[in-house]
Amino acid sequence: METVCSVCNNVRNNSKHGASFQKLLTLLRREFRSQDLDLKIKSDRDRKLNNEEFYVNAYYDAEDDYNNETPIEVVVHHNFDKEVIWDRKQITSFLTQIFDATVHEYKHRRQSIKRKHVTYSAHVKQPYDEYLADPDEIDAYAISIAIELCRSLGKYRALRYMVKFNSLCKLKFNGQFVSPNLSAYSGQFDTLDHPVLKLLAKKVYVRLQKVDTDFIFM
């Protein structure tokens, strides 16, 4: 997480006067290489999106990792005008999504390395709620959720809110969920008292206690 945060901060610092989307991709690729992080960053133009809309997906492949190939791929889905220069706020929003997606997948990589790249389960064939109940996903989402809560509430305030975890799943500030990942994750289950969500809450609490906010990009 510290290294990914450093990458994102360096890209933002090198874009103080604004940068185009293509320039940001170039800077990101260069920074990740300089930090010896092996991942691909791709862009996919989706004309169904408006000119300011985008989202980031990332994927980890245990087989590629085992074969010493690039194990993580980050894909930015967008419909950006290539000539538009982004300001600091837009750059920060973009890099935040890059940071979150990359940290999530590097957690999966650590999980995979720990079990010597043995595939844990056939995620593609599972119903989505069963996929989310996978221990690997619970652990990775706990990190992602803890990061979002630290951004929106601060670490210690977030820890206090954990006693009302069910309410936290739906909590919004300024019209935005304090943790979009938590809202989306909990929404996949019929009840907020589901055993998977109780386990997730415990994992999030532990992650909040351990996380160093100096290494959360924001």
Q: Residue spans of the language-model regions?
A:
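Active-site recognition of the HExxH zinc-binding catalytic motif
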Residues: D100-I113, A140
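Active-site scaffold of zinc-dependent metalloenzymes
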Residues: E52-T96
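Long, well-structured alpha-helical subdomains associated
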Residues: E130-A133, S144-M218
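Glycine-rich, acidic and aromatic/proline-enriched surface loops and short helix-turn segments
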Residues: H108, S112-K116, A146-L149
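Post-HEXXH active-site segment of zinc metalloproteases
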Residues: T96, S112-I138
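Hydrophobic/basic alpha-helical segments
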Residues: C5-C8
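Zn2+-dependent metallopeptidase catalytic core
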Residues: N14-D38
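Amphipathic, interaction-prone secondary-structure segments
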Residues: R29-A62
